[in-house]
Amino acid sequence: MEKNLPDIFFFPNCVNVFSYKYSQDEFSNMSKTERDSFSLAVFPVIKHRWHNAHVVKHKGIYKVSTEARGKKVSPPSLGKPAHINLTAKQYIYSEHTISFECYSFLKCITNTEINSFDEYILRGLLEAGNSLQIFSNSVGKRTDTIGVLGNKYPFSKIPLASLTPKAQREIFSAWISHRPVVLTGGTGVGKTSQVPKLLLWFNYLFGGFSTLDKITDFHERPVILSLPRIALVRLHSNTILKSLGFKVLDGSPISLRYGSIPEELINKQPKKYGIVFSTHKLSLTKLFSYGTLIIDEVHEHDQIGDIIIAVARKHHTKIDSMFLMTATLEDDRERLKVFLPNPAFIHIPGDTLFKISEVFIHNKINPSSRMAYIEEEKRNLVTAIQMYTPPDGSSGIVFVASVAQCHEYKSYLEKRLPYDMYIIHGKVLDIDEILEKVYSSPNVSIIISTPYLESSVTIHNVTHIYDMGRVFVPAPFGGSQQFISKSMRDQRKGRVGRVNPGTYVYFYDLSYMKSIQRIDSEFLHNYILYANKFNLTLPEDLFIIPTNLDILWRTKEYIDSFDISTETWNKLLSNYYMKMIEYAKLYVLSPILAEELDNFERTGELTSIVREAILSLNLRIKILNFKHKDDDTYIHFCKILFGVYNGTNATIYYHRPLTGYINIISDTIFVPVDNN
């Protein structure tokens, strides 16, 4: 469906687009093309103003029940009006008088084509649209947006590239085409903060109709923004809530969905047309109950995120529109061209609001000499922070690969630099308290972080990035450090330049960068289970296909050996984390055990019942040998004795030397089995 967005339906960015009410005199002076733009108002008016409305007679004049109170009456017969009263906004017949809006209400019946609307209908749609506050203009003021979506406060002023009229037109055309859309743009153009808001607006106006060429029944469904982490759900929902002029969730168009969500973050009066911010796992549980699907941070290749893309592509007729958003397509463009049916690619040009300077610090050691490379890197980091120092009251972010390195680098820097040092990563619980200290401190703050800070939290006073250029890629029973991809570099660099000019200092040779095929270092059981649930054909229906298909088929055989029905697996997928697939054997045993095991997965509280139940699974690892790493750590070289990876090697760190065997409790907890 090719359809352009008329100017009068632009979302108010409060820079060069404002909420506006048009007068009948303005309509009289418009060209035919401008007048015809009002025909599209029939769709939001039918949904939000005329739904369940009827004709009343108010002071002798026929009106819609949404205009005035009055007794329900039979509608009058309508021919061409004898007179038009622009001031009273009424059509006058010899026998009766009818409001502009009531005339349109009676004329706009199912299957009427909108290009057949005459001036009389359009004038009524203008009045109904004014009452809904759905129109916009290039003149106005912020306060005119109060009440547009039931908001008590005005919309935020947004100068970002994604809300310019040009971008709004392009995004609307892609959205209404029902083609899958791949949207890119530099960090800072407003992809995550503004595009979902824009799609919410389009959904409010036109969502649920099968066509915008004629009046049809509608099926209203919300928009969903699917995100890889709870921190992102909370961050982006709060940003958009405030920018739409709301201070509380209840009654707003914003809802949140994630596991163990607190009561105060539940919208008890959600809007049918609204937007749901959800973690990927919960998005999958009700994927087809949403009209527009937005998947953000596609470049991260979160496992469940990639599965959502595969499911949505397989069942694209069940979703009105799908948007994949990513900072860069460096690694995925060719795959998306082949994988998605007739995709539309949109790039929002633009950069961060402020200039970002780049500085390269060369490490003279080859990365293959790992320990020497890191020692040189730490020395270089101290020198770089001394040379390129954030101003007082500002902060810098040091990107390292792992939580362990956060502590290692913090300890090293504290001994050599006089600045406030903090650690932030996904397992830190008091991030808000840390940020309060960072924002209130008159000193320089240095924050050491994992890739978590690439997107999960926005730090408003950061001016410098110090990027080691590495990431820890988890793998079954282990993992390894790798150099980052270009998309990760872009994300890290884009943490500055949003509020003030920024500096990006990097400590790695650009030739070391490479794309990361995460699926090749993941447990694959979710791909099997969701493929069964959504009738995916493996491996061709997967967005990213594993390099080693043998592991995929071994995983399928292992899951089949559990002798759990597809129906039961689907219930387990919807209700439990199952961080280890073997937990499924326990979840099906009894409701009491399932409840305690679920609590362990959510909170980490390990009861004796859960401990003994997991130990009964005999998830055993054999210790081959060990070596001393430092004062309180020993590295153990082991062999896996269960599951898909039976017979493969693993490395485990422990505070004392172990021999014999250990039993796995979780991905981070194990129990030594002495003399066995």
Curated annotation (Swiss-Prot):
Uppermost EC category: hydrolase
Annotated GO MF terms: ATP binding; ATP hydrolysis activity; RNA binding; RNA helicase activity
Motif (DEXH box): 296-299
Triggers of expression: Expressed both early and late in the viral replicative cycle.
This protein's record includes keyword Nucleotide-binding: yes
PROSITE patterns attached to this UniProt entry: DEAH_ATP_HELICASE (PS00690), HELICASE_ATP_BIND_1 (PS51192), HELICASE_CTER (PS51194)
Keywords: ATP-binding, Early protein, Helicase, Hydrolase, Late protein, Nucleotide-binding, Transcription, Virion
Major subcellular site: virion
Subcellular localization(s) per the UniProt record: Virion
Chain sites annotated for binding ATP: G185, G186, T187, G188, V189, G190, K191, T192
Function: NTP-dependent helicase that catalyzes unidirectional unwinding of 3'tailed duplex RNAs and plays an important role during transcription of early mRNAs, presumably by preventing R-loop formation behind the elongating RNA polymerase. Might also play a role in the export of newly synthesized mRNA chains out of the core into the cytoplasm. Required for replication and propagation of viral particles.
Family according to the record: Belongs to the DEAD box helicase family. DEAH subfamily.
Protein name in UniProt: RNA helicase NPH-II
Source species of the chain: Vaccinia virus (strain Tian Tan) (VACV)
